[in-house]
Amino acid sequence: MEITDLAAEGNALCRIDDMVMFVPFAAPGDRCTVQVVKKKRNFMQGRIVSIESPSPIRKGPFCTHFTVCGGCKWQHIPYEIQLRAKEQQVTDALVRLGKVEVEEMQPILGSEQTEYYRNKLEFTFSNKRWLLPEEVQEVDGDFSPEVRYGLGFHIPGMFDKVLDIRECHLGAKVSDEIRLFIREYCMQDPERYPFFDLRNQEGLMRTLMIRTTSTGELMVVVVFFRDDVAAREALLAAVAERFPQITSLLYVINTKCNDTIGDQEVLLYHGREYIEEEMEGLKFKIGAKSFYQTNSRQAYQLYRIAREFAGLTGDELVYDLYTGTGTIANFVAGQAHRVIGIEYVPEAIEDARTNSLLNGIENTLFYAGDMKDILTNDFIEQHGRPDVVITDPPRAGMHESVIDAILFAAPRRIVYVSCNPATQARDLALLMADGRYRAVKSRPVDMFPHTHHVENVVLLVRNTE
């Protein structure tokens, strides 16, 4: 089969008898033997058995875990072609499928840094690591920790299988060093530090989170399933001694069935309880539970574009919807009269207020609650109709009542930041349905090189302007 194009979810595609087949890890121009692994009414899913003639654009992957990890599906695609594919993805979602008329489709803003760009990585300990095909027979029947223990990423679609990661080109290089040190330290005494059994909910070592900032600060969070004080203290002391540059060394005792720590107490072992990121002279406190865009450099570019689209002069009332920890709200506050941020997570709103105080920003207000319950007509009448609305919703997009509230508020400009162009197109169509708004420009931003994910910013302007 000849692979003809890149497609959704990081797949490539070919056609068999007018039916589309999605094939992961293929490149346009590849001629390959493909096995059908799933057949639906309108499409098929396949996998490469062998590549008979590689595409001239195909390049060698930079990571030994490529095709198994699932994290960077486009390592074999040159970056400039990745960018073109993401541009096309946005155009298809908005214009071809969403029927949204956009006056100016601006070119994608690529990332200067295409490796080691993530500021946050989370790893899972497992006593049943994923065995590669060449390992299966070699270790058959050997269930020793040396063979079966792993610390790394979940295999896609398999919650209880973890790929033992020896190198990762996403996070800062120090993340590799810390992860490998902790792994080897625990492996010296596996009875004292048993890796977690995800299916049977047993073990001690559960997850590991490492966060970094562009200013060089470093946070390490070790999550244990139970509290073995002596084992915990010995491990954390060893980590602190080996990596004195750690700004914040934290731990969590999580006895729940799931790995989320949002409802768990985060305890300080050494250093500060937070790290600080900096953006255009502003400081942002980041705790273990705080949300912050995982590509710091591109986050600045994304927010800069959003602020530029907002066209602020200093007199505007701005609503920042889905404000998170108030990064956008605080970022634009210096060019607005007042900014009101709304967010579902109460802890995030506390972070937003803290960040305003940290930077001496006095013209922000933050409210916590479900967006559709907070952003009502009464709220708008009480706080004033915004001149500009900036919205950055989750992948699912905005609730229809939120769209209705925005239309009631009738701002002069709406800046829509999205990590999902498909739901963005749906919401834009609703905002533009009665002709009150027109889509003036759209600009994609690549936050995640070597993946299919893309952010997009769209400016809507009220037609009376």
UniProtKB/Swiss-Prot annotation:
Top-level division of the source organism's lineage: Bacteria
GO molecular function, one term: metal ion binding
The entry's keywords: 4Fe-4S, Iron, Iron-sulfur, Metal-binding, Methyltransferase, S-adenosyl-L-methionine, Transferase
EC identifiers of the protein: 2.1.1.-
Catalytic residues of the enzyme: 419
Gene3D superfamilies (alphabetical): 2.40.50.1070, Nucleic acid-binding proteins, Vaccinia Virus protein VP39
All residue ranges annotated as the TRAM domain in the record: 1-50
Annotated positions binding S-adenosyl-L-methionine: 293, 322, 343, 392
Binding site for [4Fe-4S] cluster: 63, 69, 72, 168
Family matches, as SUPFAM superfamilies: Nucleic acid-binding proteins, S-adenosyl-L-methionine-dependent methyltransferases
Annotated GO biological process: rRNA base methylation
Pfam families named in the record: TRAM, tRNA_U5-meth_tr
Family (UniProt): Belongs to the class I-like SAM-binding methyltransferase superfamily. RNA M5U methyltransferase family.
Name of the protein in its database record: Uncharacterized RNA methyltransferase PG_1095
